[in-house]
């Protein structure tokens, strides 16, 4: 007998759960109110934890992280960059805590190497001279977008249905059990032509909430009280990659003391401040300034780096002992599977909460095991053994460089993104120009993404990184829109470009000084005037002097980052 399960949430845990259940033979439907990665997954800094960060304060989480770090290297190699990590001790930092960190890593089976400050600077020349010594650990960088999409693709390959832009507006509760979900369409997706505002009900034998920070709101639809310990964090993106190693400050408790190299950029962050509503919290300039100031204590060059955007995310923390602390930093990073039949008397419903991106697969396995136990299904988990799509043979990608007429850097970037899917995606019968020069994204990759998500350029961005470089879509958004025109028409293409451009603008608002301000005004010239997107730009008496914004570094005002 095939049981039906609805998974709510299109982040890493949700898509991982959909994959796991589909591989065990369940009839799975995943619903997500926006794009995949719309919530916490798409707003992390992509840190593949070794567990060392928690080796003193949260050993259970540390052990989970190291174990899953090894698993993800086996099944998702094309989503990971093996940067390694350094926990650096600066002058004045605690010797005692450094030794406790080493001992904690040993207890949690986390490999370490102690190196001198001189050796640390040899490996990473931009580190401050104040670094006295450091602990090397097997941290890394993981692409959360690629990882999430790969899980969704695998779920579909095993028969699952992925419904994006489908917001759950109610849980169907009958006779004391959750029997399905009611969704409201936010617009058409690749699997449904439903119009915005349409509603649809998906019946299910079991419903899993993998909604992270939104789990409390979802549970309330079934009359369940689930209190989350949500916290926010700001992250800042530089325009170039100053480092090749993940850098952490070796302190007992820190905010904003992590620097992560990712693709062509470096990410700084994040602070840890409690919020009540995951959809409504302040995003403030002082947070951006603080991230830059803290990071520059370890890597001074960051203070003068060009920042291209800032973004905020919320942590889906769960405290099994509510009100035990008011400091989010004290809340465990462990995860929990909450059986609402046992906990709240509402059957057919479970929430998976807490955890980290690094442990998403284990979280998915645990909640899938729970579903199997409740429904009497005896099928083992295989997600720790079966590689995700694109991960089977990443090394083979180099062979496609000449075959598909790609210049070396573009071939490398395309290969990293596509994994072993490169041959099927890049083998086209027409020219394959680069549409996004900043991130080296080709037409073939863009068209492949459009085939997956339809006329949704933000969905294309998540799958390819197009528009995520220095220009933030200024030079490529219209090219991406042009790829929609043949099948979707001019109006749809224009709307898609506008949505992409607005999303890109949102992240730039807190990074508008110096060279990035010049870039923003150049984008305004191109799109608002030359392309006439702002048809009324000459309606008033204002006369914008664009050259005034072209001062580069010398134009940075005193106080710099918005002080």
Curated annotation (Swiss-Prot):
Q: According to Swiss-Prot or TrEMBL, what is its membrane topology? A: Peripheral membrane protein
Cofactors demanded by this protein: FAD; FMN
| Metabolic or biological pathway, per its Swiss-Prot or TrEMBL entry | Polyol metabolism; glycerol degradation via glycerol kinase pathway; glycerone phosphate from sn-glycerol 3-phosphate (anaerobic route): step 1/1
A GO MF term: FMN binding
Q: Sorted alphabetically, which Gene3D superfamilies does this protein's record hold?
A: BFD-like [2Fe-2S]-binding domain, FAD/NAD(P)-binding domain
Family matches, as SUPFAM superfamilies: FAD-linked reductases, C-terminal domain, FAD/NAD(P)-binding domain
Query: Gene Ontology cellular component?
Result: glycerol-3-phosphate dehydrogenase (FAD) complex; plasma membrane
InterPro entries, sorted: BFD-like_2Fe2S-bd_dom, BFD-like_2Fe2S-bd_dom_sf, FAD-dep_OxRdtase, FAD/NAD-bd_sf, G3P_DH_FAD-dep, G3P_DH_GlpA_su
Protein EC: 1.1.5.3
Name a Pfam family for this protein. Answer: Fer2_BFD
- What keywords appear on the UniProt entry? Cell membrane, FAD, Flavoprotein, Membrane, Oxidoreductase, Plasmid
UniProt KW rRNA processing keyword: no
Query: Which Gene Ontology terms describe the biological processes this protein takes part in?
Result: glycerol catabolic process; glycerol-3-phosphate metabolic process
| Disulphide bridges | none
Q: Where does FAD bind?
A: 4-32
Which superkingdom, per the lineage? Answer: Archaea
Deletion phenotype:
No visible phenotype.
Q: What class of enzyme is it?
A: oxidoreductase
- Where in or outside the cell is it found? Cell membrane
**What's the subunit arrangement here?**
Composed of a catalytic GlpA/B dimer and of membrane bound GlpC.
What's the stated role of this polypeptide?
Conversion of glycerol 3-phosphate to dihydroxyacetone phosphate. Functional analog of glpA1 required for the basal levels of glycerol-3-phosphate dehydrogenase activity, but not expressed during standard growth on glycerol or when glpA1 is knockout.
Q: Which family does it belong to?
A: Belongs to the FAD-dependent glycerol-3-phosphate dehydrogenase family.
Quote the record's miscellaneous comment.
H.volcanii contains 2 glpABC operons, one located on the main chromosome and the other on megaplasmid pHV4.
Name the UniProt record assigns to this protein:
Anaerobic glycerol-3-phosphate dehydrogenase subunit A2
The organism named in the record is: Haloferax volcanii (strain ATCC 29605 / DSM 3757 / JCM 8879 / NBRC 14742 / NCIMB 2012 / VKM B-1768 / DS2) (Halobacterium volcanii)
